[in-house]
Swiss-Prot record:
PANTHER family documented for this protein: DIPEPTIDYL PEPTIDASE 3, DIPEPTIDYL PEPTIDASE III-RELATED
Cofactor binding note of this UniProt entry: Binds 1 zinc ion per subunit.
Annotated catalytic residues: E451
Entry keyword Cytoplasm: yes
Role summary: Cleaves and degrades bioactive peptides, including angiotensin, Leu-enkephalin and Met-enkephalin. Also cleaves Arg-Arg-beta-naphthylamide (in vitro).
Binding residues for Zn(2+): H450, H455, E508
Organism: Mus musculus
Name this protein carries in UniProt: Dipeptidyl peptidase 3
Length: 738
């Protein structure tokens, strides 16, 4: 059997997303709006398969054909007859559910490959003897031959997502390196093109020169007759001695489906903001224009407090090894009014609370743009995973001048972050009951502060294309050096493009730190309804949760490559290091032996020292993070962040050794089963599924009732068209991992 790092256990937690009550309260028109937006999101989410690994689209197509012909119960009888045990068949169901849940065969949280936990020959017998194989023998056999080996392979280079010899990514062709990624970013900056909706393909010509294709995601291809703001950029370029060509049409048939349902949703929009937003999204996905998506996002920001909230596009750049390309995601959700009222009170206090942050006013935005902050019950979240909260859009220029929205996903928090006592690792017994009682409420506070005042705070110092500065060069002083500002962002540079590989994690660390820092404020806790001893418990559990998460984070560190695979977890480890460095017994991490005789560890936080020792340490660290971000000082920012993020076996903590303990006692993230919406006549029905691997599989089998087989064919064709870019990738192992 495979290494436990690379399998999903048979007893993995599976929860259903509950949005029945929120959906019931929608009007018929709102339901139709939500339905078509959900359809657009689910179709678009299929692009994630093509953004993950070369084999993911084939695995998805194979599983879908298998379970369409026989549902999980019917296939079980066949599998047992073929000699599988109940445990082996369950392992296959869990694997299939994992592929659907992550939209690929790499975990969305941690970027680690997962493989089926049963022998390959047994699974092969089940697949080749299945009803699907009887109906279409050649197709099923070809799919199994194409993806069977890769499905199971744990060749060193295939274990994690990464660039070059560090791993697998389909944002770049297999021979691209970090140097190619940097060169491409310089090229994109020179043409004022965003990387968000692009992939990079490299071919080395006979003359030894590299030829790069920058391919934009769009319905349209490169036909110059189809004029748009982008047409002039679709051509060949010479750049620093290399050939570049900008093309478009990536994921075209998938995005065509997205556009069709966005057009249908427009008929049920509640106001002109929503209509104009959808029109711009249609333009963006049709043409491949990020500028159109920005315009749509501007209307989205202006659409305050809608009953049905949604966002769709190439959004988060966590999984691009370079940190610039966005993964497709789309969500549709309904407002939870009671919780939203608390967040609205937090927004009302935000301007006052921003002044509490530990940097000078010159480092804060010139004007606080009052954002929307709602608690939502998710109906649909298509992509590779579901977060607990979101602060979007990610476009720096919009965030600085137009604002943003914050959302907390209430029904996701309710199921994904629920804690069971027996599963609580690394805590003292006396902390466990307190932790269970206050984990949920403290996390609501942390998510609120993290999104609104973490991601929502801070100014970037920019010099525009005309040479004008958005800060006073003569009077603004760097509080870390006592001198005038020496560095800033030039026109075309963004936070992501400048800080690239550390940008996501650094920003998550800044937002998490703001949450810890401001949760000490009594006014914040009163907003959420906590006073006195309860307020102190919320603070303690919030800080305790963070330092425990810092230890759990070691699961997401790869020692062989000395890199982190998950931005949020790296951020939490950095915060743990900062609080350990503060000393005075504030935080201790001690190796122990568990009651089962195996290695264990205990995290302790001295609650009497949170304000006296923890707060000043966090204050100093937060100020440095913000100053280096504002000034675009990537050299000092990288040195600071990577210094704290380094994992060594230096005493007293011996983190590399502790990592083995963390892996020994790790718990897999829950899989979440989402409902479907179904149009029956003019009415939209909500279809729910049981909380099990089989239920999750059924939800996906019923997700595309009109065109499932056609979509699988499209995915196979799109994957096959680019397959040459990743041939022979597995054989090249990274150094030290052969």
């Amino acid at each position: 059997m495979a290494d436990t790092q690379y399998i999903l256990p048979n007893d993995i937690g599976v929860s259903s997303l509950d949005c029945r009550e929120a959906f019931r309260l929608l009007s018929p028109t709102e339901r139709l709006y939500a339905h078509h937006l959900s359809r657009a999101a689910w179709y678009g989410g299929l692009a994630v398969l093509l953004q993950t690994s070369p084999e993911a689209p084939y695995i998805y197509a194979l599983l879908s054909r298998l379970f369409r012909a026989q549902d999980p119960d019917q296939l079980r009888q066949h599998a047992l007859a073929e000699g599988l045990t109940e445990e082996e068949y369950q392992a296959f169901l869990v694997y299939a559910a994992g592929v659907y849940s992550n939209m690929g065969n790499y975990k969305s949280f941690g970027d680690t490959k997962f493989v089926p936990n049963l022998p390959k020959d047994k699974l092969g017998r089940v697949i080749l003897g299945s009803k699907a194989a009887q109906q279409r023998p050649e197709e099923v056999r070809d799919l199994w031959q194409t993806c069977g080996d890769l499905m199971f392979s744990l060749e060193p280079r295939l274990r994690h997502l990464g660039l070059g010899k560090e791993g697998v990514t389909t944002y770049f062709s297999g021979d691209c390196t970090m140097e190619d990624a940097k060169l491409a970013q310089d090229f994109l900056d020179s043409q004022n093109l965003s990387a968000y909706n692009t992939r990079l393909f490299k071919v080395v010509g006979q003359e030894g020169k590299s030829h790069y294709e920058v391919r934009l995601a769009s319905v349209l291809n490169t036909d110059p007759a189809l004029d748009s703001e982008l047409t002039s950029k679709l051509k060949r370029y010479e750049f620093q001695g290399n050939h570049f060509q900008v093309t478009r049409g990536d994921y075209a048939p998938i995005l065509q489906k997205v556009v069709e349902h966005l057009e249908k949703a427009k008929a049920y929009a509640a106001n002109s903001h929503q209509e104009q937003m959808l029109a711009q999204y249609v333009e963006s996905f049709t043409q491949g224009s990020i500028e159109a998506h920005k315009r749509g996002s501007r209307f989205w920001i202006q659409d305050k407090g809608p009953i049905v909230e949604s966002y769709i596009g190439f959004i988060e750049s966590y999984r691009d090894p370079f940190g610039s390309r966005g993964e497709f995601e789309g969500f549709v959700a309904m407002v939870n009014k009671a919780m939203s009222a608390k967040f609205e009170r937090l927004v009302a206090s935000a301007e006052q609370l921003l002044k509490e942050l530990p940097w000078p006013l010159a480092f804060e935005k010139d004007k606080f743009l009052t954002p929307d902050f709602t608690s939502l019950d998710v109906l649909t979240f298509a992509g590779s995973g579901i977060p607990a909260g979101i602060n979007i859009p990610n476009y720096d220029d919009l965030r600085q001048t137009e604002g943003f929205k914050n959302v907390s996903l209430g029904n996701v928090l309710a199921v994904a972050y629920a804690a069971k006592r027996e599963k609580l690792t690394f805590l003292e017994e006396e902390d466990k009951d307190l932790y269970i009682r206050w984990k949920g409420p403290s996390f609501d506070v942390q998510v609120g502060l993290h999104e609104l005042l973490g991601h929502g705070s801070g100014k970037l110092f920019v010099q525009d294309e005309k040479g004008a500065f958005n800060f006073d060069k003569e009077t603004v002083i760097n509080p870390e050096t006592g001198e005038q500002i020496q560095s800033w962002y030039r026109s075309g540079e963004t936070w992501d493009s400048k800080f690239s590989t550390i940008a996501s994690s650094y920003e998550e660390c800044r937002a998490e730190s703001v949450g810890l820092y401001l949760c000490l404020n009594p006014q914040v806790l009163e907003i959420f309804g906590f006073e006195g001893a309860d307020a102190e418990d919320v603070i303690y559990v919030n800080w305790l949760n963070m330092v425990r998460a810092g230890l759990l984070a070691l699961e997401f560190y790869t020692p062989e490559a000395a890199n982190w695979r998950q931005a949020h977890m790296q951020a939490r480890f950095v915060i743990l290091r900062v609080l350990l460095e503060a000393g005075e017994g504030l935080v201790t991490v001690t190796p122990t032996t568990g009651s089962d005789g195996r290695p264990d560890a205990r995290v302790r936080l001295d609650r009497s020292k949170i304000r006296s020792v923890g707060r000043p340490a966090l204050e100093r660290f937060l100020r440095r993070l913000q100053v280096l971000k504002s000034t675009g000082d990537v050299v000092a920012g990288r040195a600071l962040y990577e210094g704290y993020a380094a994992v060594t076996d230096a005493p007293p903590e011996c983190f590399l050794t502790l990592r083995d303990t963390v892996l020994l006692r790790k718990e897999s993230r829950k899989l979440i089963v989402q409902p479907n919406t179904r149009l029956e006549g003019s009415e939209v029905q909500l279809v729910e599924y049981e909380a099990s691997a089989a239920g999750l599989i059924r939800s996906f089998c019923e997700r595309f009732p009109e065109d499932g087989p056609e979509l699988e064919e499209v995915l196979i064709q799109l994957a096959a068209a680019d397959a040459r870019f990743w041939r022979n990738q597995a054989q090249e192992a990274p150094p030290g991992q052969a």
